[in-house]
Amino acid sequence: MVTPRMLSALSAVLLLVLTASSSARSFDASPSATSGNHSLNKRSLFDPACTGIYDRQLLRKLGRLCDDCYNVFREPKVATGCRSNCYHNLIFLDCLEYLIPSHLQEEHMAAMQTVGK
């Protein structure tokens, strides 16, 4: 049975949730976000050391491997080291060997060469 006190508490929680979500929406709808005038350029999310061909799909694939590797080992050096030098490093190769079946490793190596130096 719902008491008036419980109903009042639920109403207060609902009001807080609605207020928080509407303020978050108004924050997201800032003039720069809605006008298409983004301050970040598309490549700013990726390592500037990657001077090869810019391919979002390949970068996402390589980044996902590093994320998965970090999720397995939970070591901060894995998270940062795997992406260093545009994936040309020992940590990336170790992650590749550990997580990717051997018949698919060449595909990741080719992606690394494409986006790399």
Swiss-Prot record:
Listed GO biological process terms: circadian rhythm; glucose metabolic process; neuropeptide signaling pathway
Transmembrane parts of this sequence: none
Any one GO cellular component localisation term in the record: extracellular region
Endpoints of the signal sequence: 1-24
Disulfide bonds: 50-86, 66-82, 69-95
Keyword Disulfide bond in annotation: yes
InterPro entries: Crust_neurhormone_CS (IPR018251), Crust_neurohorm (IPR031098), Crust_neurohorm_sf (IPR035957), Hyperglycemic (IPR001166), Hyperglycemic1 (IPR000346)
Valine amide: residues bearing it: 115
Keywords carried by this UniProt record: Amidation, Carbohydrate metabolism, Cleavage on pair of basic residues, Disulfide bond, Glucose metabolism, Hormone, Neuropeptide, Secreted, Signal
Expression sites by tissue: Produced by the medulla terminalis X-organ in the eyestalks and transported to the sinus gland where they are stored and released.
Entries under Pfam families matching the protein: Crust_neurohorm (PF01147)
Keyword Secreted appears in the UniProt entry: yes
Subcellular location: Secreted
Listed Gene3D superfamilies: Crustacean CHH/MIH/GIH neurohormone
GO MF terms held by the record: neuropeptide hormone activity
SUPFAM superfamilies: Crustacean CHH/MIH/GIH neurohormone (SSF81778)
Similarity comment: Belongs to the arthropod CHH/MIH/GIH/VIH hormone family.
Job of this protein: Hormone found in the sinus gland of isopods and decapods which controls the blood sugar level. Has a secretagogue action over the amylase released from the midgut gland. May act as a stress hormone and may be involved in the control of molting and reproduction.
Protein name (Swiss-Prot/TrEMBL): Crustacean hyperglycemic hormones 3
Species of origin: Penaeus japonicus (Kuruma prawn)
